[in-house]
Amino acid sequence: MHNLELPVIVEPTALEAVLDTDGLLIVDLNEVQAYVQGHVPGAVNLAYASLIGPRPPAMGTIAGTDQLSAALSGIGLLPDHHVVAYDSEGTGKASRFLWTLDVIGHANFSLLNGGFHSWAADGHPVETTANTPAASSYSVTLGNSAIANKDYILGHLDDPNMVVLDA
């Protein structure tokens, strides 16, 4: 088991310090064209569409377990990985991915503060070679513990351990 501990929102400098650490999986949620133009070293690209279920009339719901399992296995996710996710479009794709991980019970994750734009603007290393991870066999079970309604949020405003991701 890996013992990498990062805050929920990780600064670019802190991420750079652990880039070569076992158990770290960096996930880029940008379009593939943007990914190949530059990404955080070691990052794998994940298509945002693989996280979304095509279930009318509620388009944009979470994907089913088979679809999620295939997507997460495709990026080589293991249960003990610490995932750091980012995007550069400001669309919330990375936050939505982390929420998805929370819904399926994968608790070790962080969001790169400022996304890729901040990473690159601060002069951190950038690579253009696509990373192809070894596939894993990640099993997915959906839960509801990561869905918070207004009453839950109001009841936990003073809880320093509560983090709200608007995804």
Per-region residue spans from a language model:
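Positively charged, proline/Ser/Thr-rich regional signature most characteristic
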Residues: 2-80, 154-167
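Thiolate-centered catalytic microenvironments shared by cysteine-dependent enzyme domains
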Residues: 2-4, 59-160
